[in-house]
Amino acid sequence: MAKPATILIKLLSTAGTGFFYVAKKNPRKTTEKLEFRKYDPVVRKHVQFKEAKIK
């Protein structure tokens, strides 16, 4: 069976709340770390989310 092309990553809030989203990423096509501006319900604002490893 072949290795899957996509991996799961964690998008961690930079507000320091510990809130995160889980997303898929193809590491062969997207080599840089992902950054998104998404909603953090803990602080009730849109903040920057950065890629982190799922442990």
UniProtKB/Swiss-Prot annotation:
Keyword annotations from UniProtKB, A to Z: Ribonucleoprotein, Ribosomal protein
Keyword Ribonucleoprotein tagged: yes
Molecular function GO labels: structural constituent of ribosome
A GO biological-process term: translation
Superkingdom, natural source: Bacteria
A matching Pfam family: Ribosomal_L33
GO CC list: cytoplasm; large ribosomal subunit
PANTHER family for this protein: 54S RIBOSOMAL PROTEIN L39, MITOCHONDRIAL, LARGE RIBOSOMAL SUBUNIT PROTEIN BL33M
Family note: Belongs to the bacterial ribosomal protein bL33 family.
HAMAP family the record matches: Ribosomal_bL33 (MF_00294)
Name used for this protein in its record: Large ribosomal subunit protein bL33
Originating species: Paramagnetospirillum magneticum (strain ATCC 700264 / AMB-1)
